[in-house]
Amino acid sequence: MIRPALRTDWTVEEARAIHALPFPELMHRAQTLHRAHFDPTAIETASLLSIKTGGCPEDCGYCSQSAHHDTGVKATKLMAEEEVLAAARRAKAAGAQRFCMGAAWRSPKDRDMDQLCDMVRGVADLGLETCMTLGMLSPGQVARLKAAGLDFYNHNIDTSPAYYAQIASTRTMEDRLETVEQVRRGGIKVCCGGILGMGEAEEDRIALLVTLATLPAHPDSVPVNLWNEIEGVPVQGRARAVDPFALVRIVALARILMPASVVRLSAGRTEMSDELQALCFLAGANSIFVGDQLLTTGNPAAWKDRDLLSRLGLHIAPARARPPVAAD
C-alpha cells in the first residue's frame, strides 16, 4: 500500500472538515491510513510508574499531584533505583514493551540527574524501551538522558493554545512546546498528546491535534487521555464527560493527521466500555498502558486487557530490538 507523504501544514479548517465527516467515511479514512503504516491487529503496550509523587509546584487545574490543590495525594521522595527496576521487571513480566517513569516536578534538579540516568540504563538493560516524563528539560539534561539510553520523553501539551490559560497559570503552552522541541533536537523520541473532558470545546480538541500535527515533526507517540474525576482540583467544577463517539472521532482525526504516529489510549480506559475501546482501535488507536495503576489513577486489570484483545482477534505487538546502551 502506498503511504501518502506526512504533512505538517494542516489547517484547523481542514481538520474541522475531516472531523465532521459522516462516521463511516471518517472511520474508513482513518483505518486506511492506519493499515498503510501499521499492522492493524497489533497493539503496543507500555507501563507507567510514578517515581516521585505529589508536591509539584505547577498549578495545573486537572492534576492531583499539584501542591496548589488539596487532593489528599502525599508528596514522596524520588524512588530508589532498585525499587524502580523491580517495578520494571514486573511490568515486563506482565507484557509491557516500554517502561515509563514519571516524576511530579516542574523540572528535574541537576542533583537528581545521576540517579535518573542510572534508572534509564537499568531499565534498558532489562530489554525494555525507556520513557520518562519529568517536566521541562534543559538542553544539557536532554543530552544526559539521551546518552543514558532514553528512548522516549513524554511532555503533553494538554489542550489547545486558546484553552491552555484556563487550566494552568504557572507555565504556558510555549513552555511546553519549547521542551518538546528540545527533546526532538536532542534525538529522543517525542511522546506528546492531551487530555479530553476538562470543559474544553470541540474546537479546542481539534486545535490540540492540529498543534501537534504542525510541529516540525509529528510526535512519535500521541497519548489520548480522558480526564479522571479528581476531588479538590479546579477542573472538577467545569469538567464534562466526553461523548463516546466524540472520543472515537478525535482518535480517528489523530490517525489521519499523524498517520505514522502511535496513538495511545491512556488515562480513562477504566471508564470505557469494551465496545468503545474496540471502536477506538478501529479508528487507529494502537497502544495502551498495561498494569493496574497509572500515576495516581487506576487502569484496567491485565486479565481484562488480555481478554479484550483476544475477543477482538488483536495481539500485542512484538517488542522492538534495542541497541546496547554504552557505558559511561
UniProtKB/Swiss-Prot annotation:
Iron-sulfur recorded as keyword: yes
**Pfam families named in the record:** BATS, Radical_SAM
Q: What is this protein called?
A: Biotin synthase
CC cofactor note: Binds 1 [4Fe-4S] cluster. The cluster is coordinated with 3 cysteines and an exchangeable S-adenosyl-L-methionine. Binds 1 [2Fe-2S] cluster. The cluster is coordinated with 3 cysteines and 1 arginine.
Q: Report the function annotation for this chain.
A: Catalyzes the conversion of dethiobiotin (DTB) to biotin by the insertion of a sulfur atom into dethiobiotin via a radical-based mechanism.
Q: Where does [4Fe-4S] cluster bind?
A: 56, 60, 63
Q: What is the annotated signal peptide range for this record?
A: none
Which residue spans traverse the membrane? none
**Domain annotation Radical SAM core: ranges:** 41-260
| Superkingdom classification of source | Bacteria
Q: Which reaction does it catalyse?
A: (4R,5S)-dethiobiotin + (sulfur carrier)-SH + 2 reduced [2Fe-2S]-[ferredoxin] + 2 S-adenosyl-L-methionine = (sulfur carrier)-H + biotin + 2 5'-deoxyadenosine + 2 L-methionine + 2 oxidized [2Fe-2S]-[ferredoxin]
Biological classification of the source: Bacteria, Pseudomonadati, Pseudomonadota, Alphaproteobacteria, Rhodobacterales
Q: Extract one GO BP annotation from the record.
A: biotin biosynthetic process
Which InterPro entries is this protein grouped with?
Aldolase_TIM (IPR013785), BATS_dom (IPR010722), Biotin_synth/BioAB (IPR002684), Biotin_synthase (IPR024177), Elp3/MiaA/NifB-like_rSAM (IPR006638), rSAM (IPR007197)
What are the EC numbers? 2.8.1.6
**Organism from which the protein derives:** Cereibacter sphaeroides (strain ATCC 17029 / ATH 2.4.9) (Rhodobacter sphaeroides)
The UniProt annotation places [2Fe-2S] cluster binding at 100, 131, 191, 264
